[in-house]
Design a protein with these regions (language model features):
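Hydrophobic alpha-helical membrane segments
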Residues: 1-183
């Protein structure tokens, strides 16, 4: 769900900046930017709703709204993003060749596909610049205090078992624990 929050937040932020170039009123561009992030993510969620593999998720929809709301609330309150949501990613290479094969199959072989699909390689960050809350302090403006969350051991949507169209198991790594980790 963190990915939904981050996506809606980021899309809202980019769209508000695009609307800034048009010269429209500050409040209008904040709201249009925020609604753009929410609308874009809602369209994706609607498409998921018609997919037999995914289906509609109220939790995903709520996370989308939270991401856009986080952006809008900060812009309206502070005219800046004091609490920023960020993403880092890298291509994972496993010592077990079967995991590399499975990763190539479900996440893709090239970097853009992997950046989009491989949750094992993501770390989501929430970063706060203390100086923005305490402007008279001697803290450096560049300092950010961050908390990150990532996941490991995910080689399928809901489990580490994959079946072909006939229901035959073609990949079974139920021995690999799926877990979250904090940074």
């Amino acid at each position: 769900k963190v990915g939904h929050v981050l996506s809606a937040y980021s899309i809202s932020k980019v769209n508000m900046e695009l609307w800034r170039w048009t010269g429209i009123d500050r409040n209008k561009r904040i709201w249009i930017g925020g609604m753009s992030g929410a609308a874009y993510q809602t369209v994706i969620e609607l498409l998921d709703g018609f997919s037999s593999e995914w289906g509609w998720s109220w939790a995903d929809f709520g996370a989308n709204m939270l991401g856009s709301s986080t952006f809008v609330a900060q812009e309206l309150a502070w005219n800046e993003q004091r609490i920023q949501l960020k993403l880092s990613s890298h291509k994972k290479i496993y010592s077990d060749e079967s995991l590399n094969f499975r990763s190539d199959k479900i996440f893709g072989k090239n970097v853009p596909e992997r950046l989009l699909k491989d949750y094992n390689a993501y770390t989501y960050w929430i970063s706060v610049a203390p100086k923005s809350f305490f402007p008279k302090s001697k803290l450096p403006a560049w300092l950010q205090v961050s908390l990150g969350i990532g996941a490991e051991g995910m080689f399928g949507a809901r489990s580490n078992i994959a079946k072909d169209k006939f229901g035959n198991i073609i990949f079974d790594r139920s021995d690999i624990q799926r877990y979250r980790q904090w940074y």
